[in-house]
């Protein structure tokens, strides 16, 4: 069985993203618009992370700060599920709290 996630990027004449959409047919998502995306892929052969970080030119800075904070929080959750390392997860969560405090982000 295969599952497919599709990312589409519309660029302006300077190759700057104007519109980002994504689809995941298995999840019932079709051409859902996004203002930012981060994709990380582990290359086991070279032992390095390959990344694609995209955001539209109209992405507000305050939303970008929230996006980064929420990404850091979910990365710490994923780290815990993948490693069961409670001590490092707590350290990562502390950093997330510090990050939010310094950016004066309100917790929802």
What are these regions (language model features)?
Residues 18-84:
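Active-site- and interface-proximal helix/loop "cap" or "latch" segments in soluble metabolic
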Residues 1-7:
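Structured beta-strand/loop patches that form or line metal/cofactor-binding pockets in enzymes
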Residues 77-108:
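C-terminal charged interaction modules
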Residues 11-12:
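Short, acidic, Ser/Thr-enriched surface-loop or helix-capping motifs
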């Amino acid at each position: 069985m295969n599952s497919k996630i599709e990312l589409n990027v519309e660029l302006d004449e300077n190759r700057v993203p104007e519109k980002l959409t994504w689809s995941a047919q298995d999840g019932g998502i079709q051409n859902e618009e996004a203002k930012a995306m981060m994709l990380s892929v582990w290359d086991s052969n070279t032992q390095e992370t390959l990344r694609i970080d995209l955001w539209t030119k109209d992405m507000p800075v305050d939303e970008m700060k929230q996006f980064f904070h929420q990404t850091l929080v979910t990365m710490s959750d994923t780290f815990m599920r993948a490693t069961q390392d409670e001590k490092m997860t707590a350290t990562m969560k502390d950093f997330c709290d510090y990050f939010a405090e310094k950016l004066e982000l309100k917790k929802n």
